[in-house]
C-alpha cells in the first residue's frame, strides 16, 4: 500500500473513532443535562478532542444531536423488531413490536433525547431517517399479512404509515405526560384497538 493510501486510511479511521467518541459523550451529556444545557466545549474536552472535530464530523451541535437520535431510535426499532420476531405469528409480532416501541418511551434516555429534545430541535420525527427505516419494516409485515388474508386488502404503505404514526405519537404522548406510567398502558391498549381495525372480517 502506498504511503498516501496508508495516510488516507489512517485519517478515515481517526475520523470514525472521533465520531464514535463524540456520539457516546453526547448521548451521556444530552441524557443527563438535556440538549440546551449541554456544553460542547466540555463535551469535546471530556473525550480529548476540540470543537473542530465536532464541526468536522457533524457540522454543529444540532448535527450531533441528529446522530445521537438516529443511533438511539435505530436501537429502539431493532429492539422492538426482536421482540416482535419472538411472537407466535406475523400478526402477534406486529402488535408486540408496536407495543414494545411505545413502552420504551418510559426509558429516561429515550424520553429526553428522542421524544422531547429530538422533535423540538430536529422537527417532525416522522421525517427522520430512522423512522423511515422502521416504516419499511412495518410495510413488509403488513404486505405479508395482507397476502395471508389476515388484514384487509388495503394499501400497504397507507396502513404501515398509520400504524407507525400511531406508535410514534403514543410514545411522544407518554414522554410529554406528567404521569407516563399511567399513560403507557392506555396508549398500548389504543394501539392494539387501532391495529385490530385492519383485520379482515372472518366469514
Where are these regions (language model features)?
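Basic, helix-initiating cap at the start of DNA-binding domains
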Residues: 1-33, 37-49, 62-66
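Base-recognition residues in the alpha-helical recognition helix of bacterial helix-turn-helix
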Residues: 31, 55-59, 67, 71
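Key DNA-contact positions within bacterial/archaeal DNA-binding proteins
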Residues: 52
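Hydrophobic alpha-helical connector segments
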Residues: 67, 81-110, 160-163
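Amphipathic alpha-helical packing segments from all-alpha helical-bundle domains
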Residues: 74-77, 122-150, 157-161, 185, ...
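Hydrophobic alpha-helical segments that form the core
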Residues: 100-103, 154-173, 185-195
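Amphipathic alpha-helical segments used for helix-helix packing
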Residues: 104-125, 139, 176
